[in-house]
């Protein structure tokens, strides 16, 4: 595959919803141009684990003539709290950031979620550019304009829609990504295969070894295909009024697992179990064939992703699912499949149906 950057366009209903997702290598030197001439001050938000990377981005911006600062936040989901957002707001205020200044997020999905939320709320909206450093961040969190923080009541219950000005997915950053993080991100890639692009599933099934090599052409193609799926969906439905709900395949139970586990589970692992549950639910109501449901099990297991969860946690999971944003009143709603790349919605008035499907994945 070519070393040239691939540009995937996200288009929306207004000019502020249009942006490029750039996939390639050595993309840091393109950041100043993406920020534009009007920006003077830039806050680089990064997690503790990426302090050196954050400093490198800051130094690059300083060399290009920007006034650049860094804000270091806790790693992973620990960074997605209102207190962390308040810390970032304080830094912005103390350094006189105006509406024409910008934020750059450097890190995984949790960092882009938090930085996007800070950008959306500071002065009711400033420019943000995402530089995702994890597979999960590249294919999911950084694309689509969703921002959010967690509360004691659940994940991403507080947030807004705030599309970035650009996303720079630098594949070089994946070279140092821990294997379990790579596997976690693959769950979101697989999700895109099941809801929209069967070629993703074929690639994974035929190239299991290459899928675990972040430098391979296969991984790059998987990333570009997954981003293209999400870009196409959010271009049609930014604010999740209809079509965008399909991107939540596996997430209703997945988010409930994360809540029950107090966010100690990786997002992709929880979504993997959630997809297996959704497949069993789809099968149980006659919407998904045995072969397609079993294909979930085979593909997810081949990557080392979990497909079962504890039998004794059902009530806690049910409570968590009732807080899902797709719910309408007391009615639980799930993204299900009528076949590969044929997503739909199932409204479930009777939780006994859910319990029966859960027994198929309970351990």
From Swiss-Prot:
GO terms for biological process: amino acid biosynthetic process; aromatic amino acid family biosynthetic process; chorismate biosynthetic process. The keyword Transmembrane helix does not apply. It is found in: Cytoplasm. It holds the Pfam family DHQS_C. Its cofactor is Co(2+); Zn(2+); NAD(+). GO terms for molecular function: 3-dehydroquinate synthase activity; metal ion binding; nucleotide binding. It comes from the Bacteria. NAD(+) binds at residues 75-80, 109-113, 133-134, 146, 155, 173-176. It is an enzyme of class 4 (lyase). Gene3D superfamilies: 3.40.50.1970, Dehydroquinate synthase-like - alpha domain. Catalyzes the conversion of 3-deoxy-D-arabino-heptulosonate 7-phosphate (DAHP) to dehydroquinate (DHQ). Belongs to the sugar phosphate cyclases superfamily. Dehydroquinate synthase family. This is 3-dehydroquinate synthase. It comes from Paenarthrobacter aurescens (strain TC1). The gene is aroB.
């Amino acid at each position: 595959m070519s070393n040239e950057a691939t540009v995937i366009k996200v288009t929306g209903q207004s000019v502020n919803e249009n942006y490029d997702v750039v996939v390639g290598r050595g993309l840091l030197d393109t950041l100043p141009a993406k920020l534009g001439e009007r920006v003077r001050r830039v806050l680089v938000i990064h997690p503790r684990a990426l302090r050196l990377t954050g400093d490198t981005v800051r130094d690059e911006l300083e060399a290009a003539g920007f006034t650049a600062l860094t804000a270091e936040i806790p790693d992973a989901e620990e960074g997605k709290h209102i207190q962390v957002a308040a810390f970032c707001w304080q830094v912005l205020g103390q350094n006189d950031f105006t509406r024409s200044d910008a934020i750059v997020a450097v890190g995984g999905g949790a960092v882009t979620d938090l930085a996007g939320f800070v950008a959306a709320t500071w002065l009711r909206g400033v420019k943000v550019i995402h530089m995702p450093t994890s597979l999960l961040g590249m294919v999911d969190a950084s694309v689509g304009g969703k921002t959010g923080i967690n509360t004691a009541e659940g994940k991403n219950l507080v947030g807004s829609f705030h599309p970035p000005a650009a996303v720079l997915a630098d594949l070089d950053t994946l070279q140092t990504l821990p294997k379990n993080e790579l596997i976690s991100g693959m769950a979101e890639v697989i999700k895109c295969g099941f809801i929209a692009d069967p070629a993703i599933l074929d690639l994974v099934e035929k190239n299991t070894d290459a899928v675990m090599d972040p430098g391979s052409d296969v991984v790059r193609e998987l990333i570009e295909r997954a981003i293209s799926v999400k870009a196409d969906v959010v271009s049609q439905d930014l604010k999740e009024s209809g079509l965008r709900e399909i991107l939540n395949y596996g997430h209703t139970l997945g988010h409930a697992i994360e809540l029950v586990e107090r966010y100690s589970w990786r997002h992709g692992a929880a979504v993997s179990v959630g997809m297996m549950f959704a497949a069993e639910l789809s099968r149980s109501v006659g919407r998904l064939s045995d072969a397609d449901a079993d294909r979930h099990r085979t593909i997810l297991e081949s990557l080392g992703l979990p497909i079962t969860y504890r039998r004794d946690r059902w009530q806690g999971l049910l409570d968590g699912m009732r807080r899902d944003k797709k719910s309408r009143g007391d009615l639980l709603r799930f993204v299900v499949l009528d076949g590969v790349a044929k997503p739909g919605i199932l409204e479930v008035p009777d939780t006994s149906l859910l319990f029966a499907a859960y027994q198929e994945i309970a351990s």
